Amino acid sequence: MRSFIKTHKRASSLDNSPRKSSNESPENRRNSQGSFGTELSYPSGYPPNNVLKQSSSFEPLHKLTSNKIFSSKLFKKSSNGKTSSSNTSPLLSRSDAETFAPLLSNTNNIPAIKGTRKHEWGDNDDTSESVILLNRTSMSSMSDTNQDTPDTEIVRIHPNSQQGSILSSQTSADRTPRLSLEEAEDVEDYDITKHSSLSRSQSLKKKRNRLARIHSHDDIMHLRSQSSFSSDLLGSGFSPIPEKSPNPSPLPKYERSPRKENNILDRTNLFDLRKISEASYTAEDESNFNRPFTGVAGGETIQITTSIKDSFVPSPETSHKIRFAADNVIPLSKAQIIENSASEADEDDSNEEDGEEESDSSSRFSFENGNDLCGRTASLKYYSTETNTPPLYVNDIYENDNFDDEMNYFDSNEEEDENMDHLYGGDNTALSGFAGMCTLSDDEFDRTNAAISQELSSHSSQSSKGYTERQRGFSKRDSNKSFEDGNDDYDPSNHCRSYHDIYNLSDEEEAQTINKKVTEPRKRKISDGTNKVTKYADMFLLSDDDAESGSQDEDFGDESRENDVKFNVNSERYGVEHTNLVTTQNHNLNPISFKSPSRFLDVSNVNHSPLAYKTPERNILKSPLQQPIKYHGVSSLLDNDIQGTMKNLYYIDETDEDRFLENSAESEEYYLDEINGIPEDFEFSDDENIMRNLSPLSRLNRTKLLAFRRTHSYSDRPLGVLKDNTPLNYKLEIKNKTVTFFDHNSIHRSYSEPFSSSLLHDSRKSEDNCEDRILDNKTLASPVTPNSSFTKPSPSFTQNSSLSPIQESTTSSDASPKIL
């Protein structure tokens, strides 16, 4: 409550404060406020009615608190003798360092919000109590962001020099400043401070630095869009007033040069634009470069001629000026150099610029988006990327042990398998068909031919044919061990020793039988287990292990054995013992083969091939010409080239499959009769037998159909359902018409096509011409629908599966049926 009373007293004192006399000296006003100088003061002849008045919205508290809740005695002391004094706004006595005043006479529209600023930059006394005007901000008043501000001009008077300067946010042809230049100079003469120039320069520097921190990038960009000044002026910054300057002078003023509005500043000017600490429009005459100005920038003294005329009256032709206060002041010659962007700046003045350029040195492209500098702009930069890919080392992916001296990759597992060949009696690299020939490398092929040529060099006298040394016979020792029978018939040139010998093989040589004894490594890999699948039913008894073992055993059939011995002659090492080739009479191997019988279809090869196309059930079959070949037994070129596709399939005789299906069908029919509740001694009528015989589907065909449905069911085998003679009522309602369909079924439901009852009726009339009646389509009339009465159908009609509609009433048939 005490704080509330104090607030009320303070508001009342502000509301009823006496007007100070106009003849009060500036010294007394300055000492009472405790500031270094009053920014705005009016002469004695200035009318007091034009002073800013209190806002109408700011009501005193005794008017706002006239409720019954508050006691009237609380505010009796507020009405004291001070009310007799004139109600002068305290804005005149409590002004800020930079106070804005209206230029037009209509000042009642501008609300004055009163408050106290607790902290202020600069050397001020503790007794300073300035009043803040919250109508405008310091820099945003010069922009168009404040839309609700009345269209009035704001004048700001700076006491930084004896001449002074009037800053205007805008100056147009139809607007005239409220105060003349003479009156402003009189006010400034009264407000000249007696403080030292050093303290004043320091305070101004701090205030401008404060403004530089407040101004955002948007405000600076908005100045560019409003004034359209020359971007060449932004090529360099300007230092603030130095601390040791004996005579502080106003900042230099530059004229704007005509330039297009849509020109975009380059990157150098945009960088310098960020250094601006204070910028404002200044209305000056065009001829004001007369008085020298001294500035220090990095130890360098620069003189720029500026002047302010004593008498100044703004005119409509006055152009806008901009004033800069930046970090550095550089010569005009250097500004031209920066504008041309052709040379580097001085070492003392370009330290900060060099740091900025170094940060963007890696940028290849940089440009600004947008036609004008309005607000924030997006900068897109493209940086150079490395085109050289990093080297790939062996240690990153593979191990060093998997590469030879020529950096050829090899598998260590394969090398271990090759090193184990000495346990089996030598390196046996027998080829396994055409695919094995393609897997040979050039080095292996050359080593094999070199070994054969060394053997043939000592036994070249035995060759009687015109073949090369690579295609001649082996040594005497190898030939005596290799061949026991038929040495005269054996020709080593007929075996494959090169790629071209593959095409010299005949069908008779390919069909020759082989000896039971093969090389040791191949014999160990052959499985001794017999094939368990002998009929169609055995396929369902196989487990997963049996299926895998069966597929592995098939890879080592007669064909692989034949190829192993046939190409075993091309062994790489010297001490390899070759197997013996025997005749067909000594052959005692199982002639079962699962390979596709493509070559056995040739007529010339029938008498020479004991390995005919066989199934696992039969050992010896007839010639392929007399045996029907199934669709999956027909070979193709793909089957001949790729091994292991057709030979792994099971070929089951269809008779065994049909026998299995017939046995299963009979058992299922028995189960269906039992499920349907049909007694065992049930006798079907003769009519049903006749109808069954006349049905287009005979018993044999019907059995095959049932077998097909059982084996080719997509979801599950069909299950029997108990039949009932109760008809299922199906009704169709069409407005006033109702049609009901009844389904007449017998105990044993048989399959029949539509209108079979008419066929049966015709067959009873003339049994001799039964077949002709069936083929006669004239008797196939539309089903008869009774109009009013329904007679009991004949027994033959009851056996039919057709539907008999019942028409209860007649009406239009344009409506759609409705199924209940």
UniProtKB/Swiss-Prot annotation:
One annotated Gene Ontology cellular component of this protein: cellular bud neck
Region (Disordered): 1-54, 158-182, 231-266, 341-370, 454-498, 777-820
Main subcellular localisation: cytoplasm
Biased composition, class Polar residues, residue ranges: 159-174, 779-820
Signal peptide range in chain numbering: none
Keyword terms, alphabetized: Cytoplasm, Zinc
Composition-biased stretches (Basic residues): 1-11
Location relative to the cell: Cytoplasm; Bud; Bud neck; Bud tip
UniProt keyword Cytoplasm present: yes
Biased composition (Low complexity): 454-464
Residue ranges with Acidic residues bias: 344-360
Extent of Basic and acidic residues compositional bias: 17-30, 253-264, 467-484
Recorded superkingdom: Eukaryota
Biological role stated in the UniProt entry: Involved in maintenance of polarized growth and daughter-cell-specific transcription.
Family that this chain belongs to: Belongs to the ZRG8 family.
Protein name: Zinc-regulated protein 8
High-level lineage: Eukaryota, Fungi, Dikarya, Ascomycota, Saccharomycotina
